[in-house]
């Protein structure tokens, strides 16, 4: 799977938010999108999945996304927004089963195998045993994990997530992104907006840096030097220091210091 974005410009009404943004995503990679509030991160995700009018091209395996039917687009692309939009009483299992909707026919219901896959997805994100719990009674973090499980069963080639870590604690954030990376395998890609640059540095294969609707630069935490990453990150966050340390298991981690 290859996503190619060419000269994307988008906004709301007469106000332009994104300016001539171009980049590519490759299968098996998780790309983080970093930028301050108002930089255009959410606008970019909404534009990619067709929720906002835009100019430029968005190609998935060389096919323009705007040429796909809504159903075909839902099979190929999945967006997890900052809020689920679910306001009714519904079980956690039924929320996850919504992930199969794009693959079901008219009046067709999920079968036994789909229900088992949904249970496995809930267990994978840490919600095993909560299948029948009312979604509305879950914590905000648990709701985010439930929506992630819904996305995992959908098996879309492109996964887009808008600040999925916002309602999660320290360990939950790393667990969620670890589950996403495991889900990607070799055939899928993810684009994730994040507020925490240190989390992004340690979980993402590549980072895109946005400021005022413009794509400033990109970096690869496992390849770029500390000096290059400091220089690029300072374009968004100001002067900072980046350190490479080992955690208690001896694995290298990147730490940001202001």
Spans of model-derived segments:
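The feature captures the beta-strand-to-loop junction immediately N-terminal to the Walker
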Residues: 34-36
